[in-house]
C-alpha cells in the first residue's frame, strides 16, 4: 500500500483455492489505474508528536529538531502537516524547527541521486519580502534545493551539475496570502537541453540544460533539510516559513504525465 499521506495506489490480496486435495494460496497485487509509482528514495510522513518517518523503500532516518517554531497541523487528507514558523525568515545557523535526512553513509542513496532524480513538494508560500528561503535543500558548493524566491515571488529548482543550474518559474505576481503550491523539480541524468525541468501545479514552467556536462556534485554536508537548507552539523540555514504536506525524492525523472497525476491526486 502507498503512504497514508496520499491515496492508496496498490493493494495485495491473498487468494486460496477451493481444492481440498491441494489447497494453495497466492498473492496478487491490484494496482489503481493511472497511479504513479511511489517515491523510491524519500517519502516523508509527519506524525502528531512532531517526529517524521520515511515511507519509501529506502527507509531513511529522519531526525526532528523540535522547538516552538515547529508544529503539526492535523489534516483530513495528509494526516499531519508540518508548520515552520521561524523567528527570522531565511535565517542561518538555526538549531531547532526543522528536520534532517542524513545520507552521508548511504552510498545507494547517493548513487541513485547522481544519475537523475526528482524532488516533489506540496508547500505553502507567501510574499514575505525576503530573499530565498528554502523549504527543502541540500545546498552549498554542490547539491540541490527548491527555493521560494519571495522577493519576486517565483520558484527555483537548482541542482549543481557542472555548476549551479537554476531552473525558475516565471514570477507569480502578488502572493499576499499563504498559498499552496505543488512544486516538482526533475533532472533526467543527462547534459542535454531540457534535462532539468520545473513543474508548478501540474504544469511545466521551465526547462534548461545543466551548466556543464552531466555530473552531479554533492556538497560537503550530505544531508537534506526539510524546513531549510543544509548547514553545519545539527544546524540549518535559509529557514523556511510555511507549511509542508508532501516531501518526496524519486530515483527517476518523473514524466509530465506523472507530475500531472500527482497534482490531480492532491486536488481530489
Specify the residue positions occupied by each region the protein language model found.
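Short, surface-exposed loop/turn segments at beta-strand-coil junctions that are enriched for proline
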Residues: 1-7
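A short beta-strand micro-motif common to beta-rich folds, especially ectodomain repeats
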Residues: 7-19
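C-terminal edge beta-strand
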Residues: 22-35
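Extracytoplasmic low-complexity segments
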Residues: 34-91, 206, 260-268
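Extracellular glycan-recognition modules
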Residues: 37-42, 48-56, 88-157, 190-195, ...
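Extracellular glycan-interaction surfaces
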Residues: 63-94, 120-130, 145-214
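Extracellular/lumenal carbohydrate-interaction signature centered on repeated Trp-anchored short motifs
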Residues: 103-119, 172-181, 215-218, 237-243
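Flexible glycan-contacting loops in extracellular carbohydrate-active proteins
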Residues: 208-243
Amino acid at each position: 500500500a502507498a503512504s497514508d499521506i496520499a491515496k492508496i495506489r496498490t493493494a495485495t490480496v491473498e487468494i486460496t483455492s477451493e481444492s481440498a486435495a491441494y489447497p494453495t494460496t497466492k498473492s496478487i497485487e491490484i494496482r489503481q489505474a493511472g497511479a504513479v509509482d511511489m517515491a523510491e528514495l524519500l517519502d516523508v510522513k509527519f506524525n502528531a508528536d512532531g517526529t517524521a518517518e520515511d515511507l519509501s523503500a529506502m527507509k531513511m532516518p529522519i531526525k526532528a529538531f523540535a522547538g516552538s517554531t515547529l508544529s503539526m497541523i492535523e489534516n483530513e487528507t495528509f494526516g499531519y502537516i508540518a508548520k515552520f514558523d521561524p523567528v527570522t525568515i531565511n535565517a542561518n545557523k538555526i538549531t531547532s524547527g526543522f528536520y534532517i535526512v542524513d545520507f552521508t553513509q548511504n552510498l545507494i542513496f547517493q548513487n541513485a541521486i547522481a544519475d537523475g532524480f526528482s524532488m516533489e513538494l506540496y508547500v505553502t508560500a507567501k510574499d514575505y519580502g525576503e530573499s530565498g528561503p528554502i523549504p527543502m535543500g541540500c545546498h552549498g558548493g554542490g547539491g540541490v534545493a527548491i527555493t521560494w524566491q519571495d522577493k519576486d515571488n517565483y520558484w527555483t529548482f537548482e541542482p549543481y551539475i557542472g555548476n549551479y543550474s537554476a531552473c525558475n518559474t516565471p514570477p507569480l505576481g502578488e502572493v499576499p496570502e499563504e498559498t499552496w503550491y505543488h512544486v516538482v523539480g526533475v533532472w533526467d541524468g543527462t547534459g542535454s537541453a531540457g534535462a532539468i525541468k520545473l513543474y508548478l501545479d501540474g504544469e511545466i514552467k521551465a526547462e534548461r540544460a545543466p551548466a556543464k556536462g552531466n555530473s552531479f556534485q554533492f556538497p560537503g554536508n550530505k544531508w537534506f533539510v526539510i524546513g531549510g537548507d543544509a548547514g553545519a552539523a545539527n544546524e540549518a540555514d535559509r529557514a523556511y516559513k510555511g507549511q509542508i504536506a508532501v516531501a518526496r525524492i524519486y530515483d527517476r525523472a518523473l514524466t509530465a504525465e506523472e507530475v500531472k497525476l500527482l497534482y490531480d491526486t492532491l486536488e481530489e
